[in-house]
Amino acid sequence: MDFTLMLPLICVFGADILFFTTIKSNKLDFKGKDQYRFIIPGIVILFIGSLFAGKNFTFENILITIGLIIFALLGNTCGVGKKGITTGSWFTAWSKVDDIYVENQGDKCILFYSNKNIKKRLIFKKEEENELKKYIENIIKDYNIKK
């Protein structure tokens, strides 16, 4: 196995480990969906499709595929917890959030939040709206976040 194949393996499995530790260390009280939740699984499907099209089933490619499938499953974990917000396995601590609010849009409840660099939204079930609003109100009070 040469270096050009080792580097993707190291990166993919390193990202898997990073995502797994992020998810495990930040217990989610409310699980939601990210607005871009189809991107990572789409990339994995394209990669697997290219392997089938090229009939390039080497041991290294199979290992990368296994790592990418784990990446696709872990990479879409989103929600709100006591320590902060997890979006696609990217963790944002409450101290980094500048603005946050919950809005009702039809049959879903949407949490909007932003900091200096990003504006994101998470989609939750309509049934969780009241509990989520109370939870966010407490977080706003505890961390002095703008509403």
Task: Kindly give the residue locations of the regions a language model identified.
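Short hydrophobic/aromatic-rich beta-strand segments that constitute the beta-sheet cores
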Residues: 85-87, 112
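Alpha-helical transmembrane segments and their immediate juxtamembrane interface regions
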Residues: 82-83, 97
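A short, compositionally biased
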Residues: 80-81, 104-108
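Phosphoinositide-dependent membrane-docking surfaces
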Residues: 91-106
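Eukaryotic intrinsically disordered, low-complexity regulatory linkers and tails enriched in Ser/Thr/Pro
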Residues: 1-80, 87, 147
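A membrane-cytosol interface segment of integral membrane proteins
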Residues: 109-147
